[in-house]
Swiss-Prot record:
<keyword id="KW-0708">Seed storage protein</keyword>
<dbReference type="Pfam" id="PF00234">
    <property type="entry name" value="Tryp_alpha_amyl"/>
</dbReference>
<protein>
    <recommendedName>
        <fullName>Allergen Sin a 1</fullName>
    </recommendedName>
</protein>
<feature type="compositionally biased region" description="Acidic residues">
    <location>
        <begin position="42"/>
        <end position="53"/>
    </location>
</feature>
<dbReference type="InterPro" id="IPR016140">
    <property type="entry name" value="Bifunc_inhib/LTP/seed_store"/>
</dbReference>
<feature type="region of interest" description="Disordered">
    <location>
        <begin position="34"/>
        <end position="62"/>
    </location>
</feature>
<dbReference type="InterPro" id="IPR000617">
    <property type="entry name" value="Napin/2SS/CON"/>
</dbReference>
<keyword id="KW-0758">Storage protein</keyword>
<comment type="similarity">
    <text>Belongs to the 2S seed storage albumins family.</text>
</comment>
<dbReference type="GO" id="GO:0045735">
    <property type="term" value="F:nutrient reservoir activity"/>
</dbReference>
<keyword id="KW-0020">Allergen</keyword>
<feature type="propeptide">
    <location>
        <begin position="40"/>
        <end position="54"/>
    </location>
</feature>
<keyword id="KW-1015">Disulfide bond</keyword>
<comment type="function">
    <text>This is a 2S seed storage protein.</text>
</comment>
<dbReference type="InterPro" id="IPR036312">
    <property type="entry name" value="Bifun_inhib/LTP/seed_sf"/>
</dbReference>
<comment type="subunit">
    <text>The protein consists of two chains linked by disulfide bonds.</text>
</comment>
Length: 145
């Protein structure tokens, strides 16, 4: 089957990592709070180098993000993007249900979904995973799926 898990080993890692539970919560939280506070997603949001030298500085990661980074560091580099893609997909389904119940479909839903993928794309870089910087998800609006 196609989809994010063309590499069987990664599917197994995804299940062992409990589907990156902390990352899913983080993606969900980021996508839903549109436009409030630092988003931790965009390239110029903060300087990663300073972050490395000064771990206790003002850029300290929220605990949930730290948990998510720990989950990603346990993955093999090869599997980081496929497992993140799996997590993004799971969050997309949650959000679709949630907004569907509130009757908020359409443009708002598309906006939230694109935020999920945008956040996921940059997670390896935010988490300082050496071998992976940005996952090549399509940033464009996802079509019907």
């Amino acid at each position: 089957p196609a989809g994010p898990f063309r590499i069987p080993k990664c599917r197994k890692e995804f299940q062992q990592a409990q589907h990156l539970r902390a990352c899913q919560q983080w993606l969900h939280k980021q996508a839903m709070q549109s436009g409030s506070g630092p988003s931790w997603t965009l390239d110029d949001e903060f300087d990663f180098e300073d972050d490395m030298e000064n771990p206790q500085g003002p850029q300290q990661r929220p605990p949930l993000l730290q948990q998510c980074c720990n989950e990603l560091h346990q993955e093999e580099p090869l599997c980081v993007c496929p497992t993140l893609k799996g997590a993004s997909k799971a969050v997309k389904q949650q959000v679709r249900q949630q907004l569907g119940q509130q009757g908020q479909q359409g443009p708002h839903l598309q906006h939230v979904i694109s935020r999920i993928y945008q956040t996921a794309t940059h997670l390896p870089k935010v988490c300082n995973i050496r071998q992976v910087s940005v996952c090549p998800f399509k940033k464009t609006m996802p079509g019907p799926s």
